[in-house]
Each structure stands twice: as C-alpha cells, then as structure tokens.
C-alpha cells in the first residue's frame, strides 16, 4: 500500500457547530418543492371542522396531506411504508418537519378527510385552469375496471340467493304446518295468507316459546320425546328466520346488480382484462370512469356496473356539481354510443364526438354494406315506408317500445312486406319461417348516428379521435404500469373513492411537475421550479387578499 495515499476525512459521528437546513441537499427543481408550494396555497379550512378543540393537539393537516400525496407520487400506498420513510428519507423528513406520525395516525387521517378530499381535488383542477394547463371545455372519457381488495371467491349471485330463498320459504311453510299441529287452534297461524318475513317469524317463534313455557312439565317418556321435538322445531324456526334475514339483506345490498362480494358489498363481479388463467373468471371490482384533458384527470367516478353505456349520464351529471357547468365537447369511444346518451348530450347542449357500435366497421376500406340490412334499404320519409331490394313496398304496421337496463324507453317502428312468398331473394333476405319479412327501425337513433358520423368524419372530429387515444389511455397506462395502481386497497365504496381521490391529486401534481420539466428546442429546461413557485405563491397571496376585501365589502 502506498505511503503517500490520503483519503478524505470520514467521521459519521461529527457534530456541527451551526445546524444546517435539511433541504440544503434537496434539489431546487425537485417535485417535492412544487408539491409543498401547491398544498400550502390551498384552502384547507374545511378540515378544521373534522377536529375537536379538546384533547391532544393533532398533527397539522397540511403536513399530513403533503406526506401522503408525496407517497402516492412515488408509488407508496402503504401507511406502514410511509411511517418508515418518515424516519429514513430526507424528503419526507423535510415535508413533515421532523414529525413522525405512526401508520395508524396516517390511516386515521385518510379516513377522517374522506368527505373533504374531493374538494381539494376540485381546487387543484381549478388552479390548473387558472394556469392554462386545462380549460374544462373538452372531456375525453374512458373507463377501466379496477379489482377490489376482496377475494375472488367471496361471490354472492342474485339468482342463487333468489332460488335458495324460495326453497327456504317452502321449508318454513312446512315447518309452520307442523307447528300448527302442535299448538292450540286459537294460536295457530294461517300459513297460506301469512306474509313470511323475518319479523313475522320472530313473532311466531316468540309465541311458540311462550306456549312451550306454559306447558306442563313432561313426565312420561312419550311426553319428553314430544317436548324434545317441539324444542327442535323452535330452534329450526329461529335458524330459518336468521337465514331469511340474511337473504333479504343480500338482495338489498345488490340494489339491482347480479352479484356482490361478501366482504365488499359495493363491489360487483366483472371480467377483468388481466386474466392469468385465460378462463374468463370474474373478480370483484369497480368500473372507474375518468375525464381527462392534456393528460390531467379532471373528473372521475366509480360505478358497480361493468358496461360503460350506463355510466355516461351519471358521470357527466356530476360534472356541473364539481365545476358548475358541462364541458362543451365530449369525446368517447363506441362503448358510450346509445340513444339515451346521444339524447342527453343533445338536450344538455354538448357537442358529442361519441362513436356508435358500427362506426369502425362502416369506415373500413374494404367494407361492403349488406344490401338486405335495414340501414341499406330505401326509405321514403313522406310516405313512411321502405322499399326492399326486389322493389316491394314495406308499410308501417306499428311501434314497439323497449326498455333498457337503465330504465330508458326507446321506440322502434315496425315495417312489414306484403308478398315474400316465391321471392327469388328470400334466402338472402331473411331466415324466418314467416312469409312476410318484418323489420324494426329506431328513427331517432339513426338520426343521432348520422349526426355523430358527420362530426366524427369532419376535420375536427378526426383530430379529436386521434387525441382520445392518447388522453385517457395514457392516464390508465401511467396509473397501472408506471405507478403500480392496479388494485384498490380498501373495502367499501366511500373508502375506495377516498383512496383514488388521493391518487388523482398526486397524479395531477406529478403530471404538472413533468410538464414543467419539459425540454425546449435548444435542449435547455424551459423554466425552473423556483421561478414557478414564486409566481404561484404570489398569485395565490393576491387572490387571498382580493377574497378578504370582497368579504369585507359584502359584510
């Protein structure tokens, strides 16, 4: 070993005469600084009502919010991992100001603010609007299925519950007949006219118990056997009443759905895209709907139904409640194209670039329309009749109403040909046994489809269709692949919504940081975080001063 070799001085236990700032080692352009400036500028006065004046002083909600959001930005969703990082990571130590809440405190804070965190998300989006990152004029809609925390074998099917409930009611009727034979005639229950509910069964079992208690003591062997039989029927009736109450509770929890999970009744069993066994197995989950703009999440909602068609109206209906108005333009795929949704957009004054189910098929280069399809037949609007390929007139015979799963009633006109027997094109026209072909046409839906086709094939429509592929799909890709948010970690819809709201806020802040660090044409950073933070804080300070002046003027 060389004698003149010198190492740098190393003393991990050395003490400093003057304490240094902990953020001296945090870069000025780090996302943690923009997160801190954004949260400090938000109005968290709504959190004050969630705390009590008495007792030990709680941790400041701004500190807790910053720590949780920074964890979500870095793919850390476990409260126990956050607790460890508060001891080890300099970024977390700086955000918390050397405070170290444990995992239970962090989890309690999330549950405490679950009704207020949605307002914070709205404030953040409005700040993005003020800064020009989003406009809320257009919404790119799409949905994805997120698996619930519940186990995949905790399923409860509606048909099974209804079938077992009918079998149980039949057992109860037979048991009540046996009880009537054992009880006095004046206390016997009329099984045929009696409404079998858990409450009535409880009353019957109570009367039966009183009758057993007032009976004389059994002495002989036959009397004791009869007494044991009565006690057995009494216990069996109680078990049937409890089981009937359980079945009724399951049906109430379903709320029109076909399945629920035992441990997470808000979740519905759906077929997920991630199917490892490739057998189409259903898993408990939620249908997550988002609206994005410039790859920022502007709105979201969770639904129990797996199809996107029924989520369109309630999802867009929540937009005015959050921002006070509808978006002027909506872009969505063919999963949302239905008469009910088109009519809603027409009445709300929304320009809808929404595809219908046959849009892609009709616009393929090699597409050849079916000559015998009702859409290809000639329609005389004045006479309200169709002409078949053989030139025969198809007159209108009536109107048929159909009800969708959401309760919407659509009307279809029926048209029937007069002479189809002996037609040389009959084998190509239709396959029914009847000698007269009948077609159903929804004129209102066809009008909406023509309007949607004109919008989608216009120059603006082609542009919007191209942007839709990189808007919500990019958000889902970042969420599932890069941020590892593929499954919910809570049970119950209220907690699941709370968890995703935290994620949506963290996602938007992370996207904001990414946009601020974009490289310009010369290869240099367009602006540093320091300049943006100063401008942002000054803007929010002036906004607070204006609000104070306005409150004094109106007081």
Q: Can you name each region flagged by the protein language model?
A:
Residues 1-33:
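Hydrophobic alpha-helical membrane-insertion signals
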Residues 3, 8-9, 68, 75-88, ...:
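Anion-binding and metal-coordination hotspots
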Residues 42-43, 72-75, 90:
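Short alpha-helix boundary/capping elements
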Residues 92-97:
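Secretory-pathway/luminal and periplasmic proteins that interact with or process carbohydrate-rich
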């Amino acid at each position: 070993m060389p004698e003149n070799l010198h190492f740098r001085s190393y003393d991990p236990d050395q003490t400093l005469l003057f304490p240094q700032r902990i953020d001296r080692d945090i870069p000025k352009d780090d996302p943690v600084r923009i997160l801190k400036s954004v949260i400090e500028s938000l109005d968290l006065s709504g959190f004050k009502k969630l705390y009590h004046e008495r007792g030990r002083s709680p941790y400041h909600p701004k500190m807790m919010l910053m720590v949780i959001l920074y964890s979500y930005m870095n793919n850390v969703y476990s409260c126990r991992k956050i607790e460890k990082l508060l001891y080890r990571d300099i970024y977390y130590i700086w955000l918390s100001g050397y405070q170290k809440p444990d995992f239970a405190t962090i989890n309690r804070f999330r549950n405490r603010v679950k009704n207020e965190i949605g307002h914070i998300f709205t404030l953040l989006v409005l700040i993005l609007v003020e800064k020009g990152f989003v406009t809320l004029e257009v919404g790119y809609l799409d949905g994805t299925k997120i698996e619930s925390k519940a186990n995949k074998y905790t399923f409860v099917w509606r048909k099974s519950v209804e079938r077992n409930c009918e079998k149980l009611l039949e057992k109860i009727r037979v048991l009540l007949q046996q009880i009537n034979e054992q009880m006095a005639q004046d206390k016997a229950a009329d099984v045929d006219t009696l409404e079998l509910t858990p409450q009535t069964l409880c009353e019957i079992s109570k009367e039966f118990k009183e009758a057993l208690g007032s009976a004389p003591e059994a002495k002989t062997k036959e009397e004791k056997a009869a007494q044991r039989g009565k006690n057995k029927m009494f216990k069996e009736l109680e078990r049937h009443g409890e089981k009937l109450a359980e079945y009724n509770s399951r049906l109430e929890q379903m709320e029109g759905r076909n399945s629920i999970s035992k441990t997470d009744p808000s979740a519905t069993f759906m077929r997920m895209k991630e199917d490892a066994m490739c057998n189409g197995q259903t898993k408990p989950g939620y249908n997550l709907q988002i609206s994005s703009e410039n790859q920022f999440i502007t709105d979201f909602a969770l639904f129990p139904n797996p199809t996107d068609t029924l989520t369109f109206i309630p999802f867009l209906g929540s937009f005015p409640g959050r921002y006070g108005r509808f978006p002027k333009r909506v872009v969505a795929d063919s999963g949302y194209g239905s008469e009910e949704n088109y009519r809603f957009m027409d009445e709300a004054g929304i320009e809808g670039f929404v595809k219908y189910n046959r849009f892609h098929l009709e616009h393929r280069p090699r597409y050849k329309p079916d000559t015998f399809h009702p859409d290809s037949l000639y329609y005389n609007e004045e006479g309200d009749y169709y002409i078949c390929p053989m030139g025969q007139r198809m007159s209108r015979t009536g109107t048929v109403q159909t009800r969708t799963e959401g309760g919407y009633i659509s009307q279809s006109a029926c048209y029937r040909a007069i002479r189809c027997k002996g037609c040389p094109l009959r084998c190509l026209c239709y396959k029914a046994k009847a000698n007269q072909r009948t077609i159903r046409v929804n004129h209102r839906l066809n009008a909406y489809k023509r309007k949607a086709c004109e919008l989608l094939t216009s120059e603006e429509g082609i542009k919007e269709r191209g942007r839709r592929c990189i808007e919500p799909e990019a958000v889902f890709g970042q969420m599932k692949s890069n941020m590892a948010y593929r499954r919910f970690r809570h049970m119950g819809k209220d907690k699941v919504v709370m968890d995703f709201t935290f994620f949506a806020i963290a996602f938007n802040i992370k996207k904001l940081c990414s946009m601020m660090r974009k490289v310009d044409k010369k290869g240099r950073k367009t602006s540093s975080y320091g300049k943006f933070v100063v401008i942002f804080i000054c803007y929010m300070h002036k906004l607070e001063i204006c609000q104070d002046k306005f409150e004094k003027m109106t007081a």
